[in-house]
Regions:
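Structural signal for beta-propeller blades
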Residues: 18, 28, 68-70, 108-111, ...
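Beta-rich catalytic cores
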Residues: 24, 48-49, 89, 106, ...
């Protein structure tokens, strides 16, 4: 048997939800629903809940809209938090080599957090530095993606940063500045790199 951890929330509340689901021979069974209070209720955003998670041994890193919490699996208690004044509408989060890679949707950035020091390296998706990745002269407009509203983030086996894009309805290799695949019929919502392959979902229900 295997277990699945699902993050969520409620449109009319500020709490987050971590649901443990067990896959059995008879189907999927909900083991527990665990409500997680926002670490700072005074800045909690209604309807966001927990927008992204990354498992780290006996813990899970969980993104609220504007703060990241480390939650212990044994009792679902928050044991640590990461704060930054530029955290704004955080979405998916992934863990790679003791670093958290965060899709900071509202700030239009990729935030890379060194867990040993809590230092944050920020890739500004609207800044000049990232724009330098574009070819100076290129007739193919498809090579110059405009970066707006990232929904998800993952790291491939070559350590490229892969982003799901809402407005473009596509997947972007940010490191190489290349589109992956074609434009889809609805926005890309979640992207994962698993066993050498990119898996993703769209708002319209494509997997």
């Amino acid at each position: 048997m295997s277990r699945i951890l699902v993050s969520g929330g409620f449109f009319d509340q500020t709490i987050g939800l971590l649901t443990v689901i067990e896959k059995t021979t008879e189907g999927l069974v909900v083991v527990s629903d665990n409500e997680i209070e926002h670490p700072k209720p005074e800045i909690a955003v209604l309807g966001k809940g927990i927008t992204g998670i990354a498992i780290d041994g006996d813990y899970v890193w969980a993104c609220f809209s504007n703060i990241i919490a480390k939650v212990r699996f044994s009792d679902f208690v928050i044991v640590d938090v990461i704060e930054d004044k530029h955290f704004n509408d955080l979405h998916e989060i992934t863990l790679h080599k003791n670093r958290l890679y965060v899709a900071n949707t509202g700030y239009e950035s990729v935030d890379i957090i060194d867990l040993a020091t809590k230092k944050i390296e920020r890739i500004d998706l609207l800044g000049e530095d990232i724009r330098k990745n574009r070819p100076k002269y290129q007739q193919n407009q498809d090579s110059k993606p405009h970066l707006h509203h990232i929904s998800s983030i993952t790291i491939d086996d070559e350590e490229n940063i892969i982003l799901g894009m809402v407005r473009q309805q596509r997947i972007l290799n940010l490191t190489k500045w290349e589109w992956i695949g074609s434009k889809y019929s609805s926005p890309v919502h979640d992207v994962e790199f698993i066993d050498g392959e990119i898996w993703f979902t769209t708002v319209g229900g494509l997997i």
